[in-house]
């Protein structure tokens, strides 16, 4: 039997993940069996288990893949992008919206599944770290005006660097609270409401 190429392996893994997500959305994580995933994927059990140890492994990989998608999206933002810029980018990105909705539906159908809790335990800290990194140049620019922070990073004092880090972190937390509220409200609202909800959320964030 010929060895699979890296591209084929990646395609198989993606095929398995998408099949599993479809099952999780339909039945809930708890009620989905590996047999369900195998059937939905159209692959053999041997093929599935050559890539993943079980459905929790698939779930963790799916979440990490979606985090990587978010990270890649943030990396497309120009240096100095602020909270409103980030929200606009997310608002107009269908992949992020679809991923958020899918994860919310999976979580809602399996609220008490310990595997879900384990798989998502690091999601918030990782997401916060991505946002903090994105907002740090913006925070430095804002504080250089408000607090006379030196715009040249090589000439800043440790106290100034700490102030920038705190401001970026606090703004990231504020952004995450507004963003999650906006996405949750949009999820339970109508498609026609989404643009209005985006404008409301954007108005709550600094430029």
Go through the PLM ranges and name each one.
Residues 15, 19-57, 61:
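Helix-turn-helix
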Residues 39, 53-57, 61, 78, ...:
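Residues in soluble alpha-helical coiled-coils and helical-bundle/repeat scaffolds
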Residues 61, 72-100, 148-161, 171-172:
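Hydrophobic alpha-helical connector segments
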Residues 64-69:
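Short, basic, alpha-helical segments at the C-terminal edge of helix-turn-helix-like DNA-binding modules
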């Amino acid at each position: 039997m010929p060895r699979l190429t890296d591209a084929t392996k990646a395609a198989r893994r993606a095929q398995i993940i998408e099949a599993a997500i479809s099952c999780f959305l339909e039945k809930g994580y708890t009620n989905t069996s590996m047999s369900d995933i195998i059937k939905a994927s159209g692959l053999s059990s041997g093929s599935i288990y050559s890539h993943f140890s079980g459905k929790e492994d698939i779930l963790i990989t799916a979440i990490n893949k979606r985090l990587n998608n978010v990270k890649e999206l943030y990396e497309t933002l120009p240096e100095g992008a602020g909270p409103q810029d980030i929200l606009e980018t997310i608002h107009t990105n269908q992949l992020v919206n679809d991923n958020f909705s899918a994860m919310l539906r999976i979580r809602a159908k399996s609220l008490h599944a310990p595997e879900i809790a384990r798989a998502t335990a690091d999601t918030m800290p990782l997401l916060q770290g991505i946002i903090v990194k994105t907002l740090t140049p913006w925070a430095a620019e804002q504080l250089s005006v408000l607090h006379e922070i030196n715009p040249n990073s090589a000439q800043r004092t440790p106290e100034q660097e700490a102030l920038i880090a705190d401001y970026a972190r606090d703004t990231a937390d504020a952004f995450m609270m507004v963003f999650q509220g906006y996405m949750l409200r949009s999820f339970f609202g109508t498609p026609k409401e989404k643009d209005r909800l985006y404008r409301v959320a954007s108005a709550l964030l600094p430029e």
